[in-house]
């Protein structure tokens, strides 16, 4: 099955690279978009939902209100208790000397059209961006950015101050990516996933796209500037009982490819360097690895049978490992031709 979004992105980039060979420049940047957690609460009945008649909370700033970061993607009434890892905005800008495009991904559940248009309208003319794509990873373990997951079914969980800051963060990431533009060479790969970490389609008809698609940008000396990875899975493997903000499987893939695969402080596999950008692919209804779907952690050599951070790590690192192995085995296609898109 073809991945339409990624095919269009590759087509556009390759068109630039072919027509203006030798002039390709790329810049990556990333920064945290993690909201501040102010008030603390205790989930007395352990249902991952805040009930003021049962659960306890501390008014840290003394304003008499429960200042929650409402988590998106699953049930209402799910305020964050802490931060597992930072959620990020990751940007890439690609310039062939004639055209310039920008892509920014944010570890959020979704972004409304009006919000995206406001970002495009705020882009300064001197950035010379011909097109900007703003993408949400569809993260189910981050803040509500669409108004569907607040303190009740009919109450928004969106914090307007956070959304204003998010807009600025996305623009700052783009600006930094432009500042980081440098000459680049591009290679690409279509990579099968490890069958020990299978993706499941939870609704009929059962149609699964199991491939990872990757674009790797490198310097003339061979060092990695950044990698753009596309894979179709719901970013939700910590699941609905999780009360810590996290970038989930997307974050583990990014850190694994860029920094290496770590368990605690032990480096088990070297990464490729640079910055990694995740684009969520075909996740329809409904590509995931459910809480009862077992996967195998090849680094810990054990089967994980429950949802949680360990499962997100195992799946994300498995994807990262596949990309790293493909690169180390010289199976990325250098300076790919447009005809490669037909496969």
Report the location of each language-model feature.
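Ordered core of a single globular domain
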Residues: 318-321, 339
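Conserved beta-alpha junction segments in alpha/beta enzyme cores
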Residues: 22-136, 142-303, 307-314, 327, ...
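Sec/Tat signal peptide C-region and signal peptidase I cleavage site
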Residues: 16-21
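Catalytic cores of secreted or luminal carbohydrate-active enzymes
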Residues: 332
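Bacterial N-terminal signal peptides
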Residues: 7-15
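Positively charged n-region of N-terminal signal peptides that target proteins for export
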Residues: 1-5
């Amino acid at each position: 099955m073809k991945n339409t979004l990624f095919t269009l992105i590759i087509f556009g980039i390759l068109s630039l690279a072919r027509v203006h060979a030798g002039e390709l420049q790329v810049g990556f940047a990333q920064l945290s978009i993690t909201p501040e957690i102010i008030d603390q609460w205790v989930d007395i009945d352990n249902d991952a939902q805040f009930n003021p008649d049962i659960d306890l909370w501390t008014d840290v700033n003394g304003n008499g209100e429960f200042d929650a970061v409402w988590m998106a993607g699953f049930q209402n009434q799910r305020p964050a208790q802490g931060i597992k890892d930072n959620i990020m905005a990751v940007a890439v800008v690609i310039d062939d000397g004639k055209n310039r495009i920008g892509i920014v991904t944010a570890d959020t559940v979704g972004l409304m059209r009006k919000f995206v248009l406001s970002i495009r309208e705020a882009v300064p003319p001197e950035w010379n961006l011909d097109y900007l794509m703003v993408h949400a990873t569809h993260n189910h373990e981050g803040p509500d950015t669409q108004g569907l997951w607040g303190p009740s079914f009919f109450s928004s969980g969106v914090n307007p101050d956070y959304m204003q800051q998010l807009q600025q963060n996305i623009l700052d990431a783009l600006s930094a990516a432009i500042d980081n533009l440098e000459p680049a060479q591009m290679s690409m790969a279509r990579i099968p996933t490890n069958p020990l970490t299978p993706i499941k389609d939870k609704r009929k008809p059962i149609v699964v796209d199991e491939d990872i698609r990757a674009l790797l940008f490198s310097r003339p000396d061979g060092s990695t500037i950044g990698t753009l990875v596309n894979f179709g899975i719901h970013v939700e493997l910590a699941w609905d009982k999780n009360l810590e903000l996290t970038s989930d499987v997307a974050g583990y893939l990014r850190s694994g490819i860029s920094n290496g695969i770590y368990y605690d402080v032990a480096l088990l596999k070297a990464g490729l360097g640079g910055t990694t950008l995740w684009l969520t692919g075909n996740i329809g209804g409904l590509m995931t690895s459910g809480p009862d779907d077992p996967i195998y952690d090849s680094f810990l050599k054990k089967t994980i049978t429950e949802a949680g951070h360990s499962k997100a790590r195992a799946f994300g690192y498995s994807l990262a490992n596949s990309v790293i192995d493909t690169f180390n085995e010289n199976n990325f296609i250098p300076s790919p031709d447009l005809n490669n898109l037909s496969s």
